[in-house]
Amino acid sequence: MLNQPASEIELLRAAYAAFNARDVNAALALMTADVAWPRAFKGGFVRGHEEVRAYWTEQWSEIDPHVEPSAFHSEESGRILVDVHQVVCDLAGSVVADEHVGHRFTIDHGLIQVMEVCSLPSSG
């Protein structure tokens, strides 16, 4: 059951919408200045707005990812786990990945502080 404030869910929905629209400035406005963001296809993390901007610019020059949140789960730690349907195409439009992935967010004072890629709990 989701116990997160609606404002946090709306924050995350807005971040996904900005990412999918390639509106970097709108997405960065939803993050803390020292945000930690995973380099999902390369490993490690980038930190801060300029590193996130550079990473996304590089990523979008190589692949065309689209991410849609399908469910939000509150965790005991206060973080939010998002079940995300991720479709990644190459620049020619061919699908190279179509899967559900987990994104775990830490929110600080109404802004995204950390995002991690993680496994989703099994539905078994």
Residue ranges and their predicted role:
Residues 1-30, 123-124:
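Short, low-complexity N-terminal intrinsically disordered segments enriched in polar/charged residues
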Residues 36-46, 58-62, 118:
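A short gly/proline-enriched turn/hairpin at secondary-structure junctions
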Residues 1-3, 53-124:
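A beta-strand edge to alpha-helix "cap/lid" segment located at domain peripheries
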Residues 12-15, 26-28, 35, 48, ...:
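Hydrophobic pocket/interface hotspot
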Residues 22-25, 38-43, 91:
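Short, charged low-complexity linear motifs
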